[in-house]
From Swiss-Prot:
It comes from Rhodopseudomonas palustris (strain BisB18). It comes from the Bacteria. HAMAP family: IspG (MF_00159). InterPro entries: Dihydropteroate_synth-like_sf, IspG_bac, IspG_bac-typ, NO2/SO3_Rdtase_4Fe4S_sf. The keyword Membrane does not apply. This is 4-hydroxy-3-methylbut-2-en-1-yl diphosphate synthase (flavodoxin). [4Fe-4S] cluster binds at residues 310, 313, 356, 363.
Amino acid sequence: MNKLENPLSHDVAGPAPRHKTTQVMVGDVAVGGGAPIVVQSMTNTDTADVAGTVEQVAALTRAGSELVRITVDREEAAAAVPHIRDALRKRGITTPLIGDFHYIGHKLLADYPACAEALDKYRINPGNVGFKNKRDSQFADIVEIAIKNNKAVRIGANWGSLDQELLTKLMDENAVSAKPRDVRAVTREAMVQSALLSAARAEEIGLAKNKMVLSAKVSAVQDLIAVYQDLASRSDYAIHLGLTEAGMGSKGIVASSAALGILLQQGIGDTIRISLTPEPGGDRSLEVQVAQELLQTMGFRTFVPLVAACPGCGRTTSTTFQELARSIQDFIRVEMPAWKTRYPGVENLNVAVMGCIVNGPGESKHANIGISLPGTGETPAAPVFVDGQKFRTLRGANISGEFKALVIDYIEQRYGAGVAAPVTVTAAE
């Protein structure tokens, strides 16, 4: 074989076939079993604050979150859950709610049956559901309540709260092994076993496989990839992907995207959450936007029109193309909730905003509608392309406003009738 030949190359670009998993219904949202990969998020409000939690769930839903997890950590939070659900429904929001339980989940669900009924899924952490002789009984209590209420369960192992008895057992076995493994490898094995043993126990109690989702989260990218590859190879439970404690800003976005992107490309993952630490006063909805953009840029789903824009260089000393790209992108995000109903299919739109003649015309032709703004020293004219054909040339001080109007016209023509239709291209000016 030629050294430059890629043995994995293929004629059709795309991810590996999806890992076959058992479908789980969380409320009315299908997870796994070939269903579209689901975006979920988590609030950071005090769940006992009904009004504040309702506002944040509503904001996350508007951003596109299809499942929302809320902390249920004490009696006041458990008592608030049905009121949160009811307030959301009064607003017409039916996004399934997931209760996040640690330490005393068995007690809260038993003492507050309205909470158990209002939630659509319970998250159990096998590392802290109970300790020593209480672990099995407290785990069983939650599973039995889930069965009684016909609810789904996520068994979510996390290496920050890993079952220490299991980890110690595996470490001791490894210490006397003829071929001892690296400590991190043993820890990964403990993560996978924690999830799988708990799932097997839940099935013994009577919880059906189509009621269970598994996760095994770590904060190191390479370890996360290895853990989920192992978990997927050893089971067909629906899988929730997430890099725990990903961090703030670009670091969190890059780390999560790197880890989840590789796993998704390998066909692993049925629902994802991007666990970003928000900036002080920052928008919690950013994690939803990043999750959507990851899935869309990889070709798994379409949520909003894509805006392609060049990075800029010495040929583009003008900031016009940057301002226009930002303006178009922000405009699309704001309008999408209304557009989803008014313009079915608009999420498939591609817009290009380019800054000079080098790649501008070519990239614009690849988009549904694109503009190539003049670079430094170039003729002060901006050709607009529609579906690969030159449509018009914009000049003057209001190029940005005119192009935005053309984008709106394109959307109305192509998607306004409820069915995607060709756009009439008049002679280029």
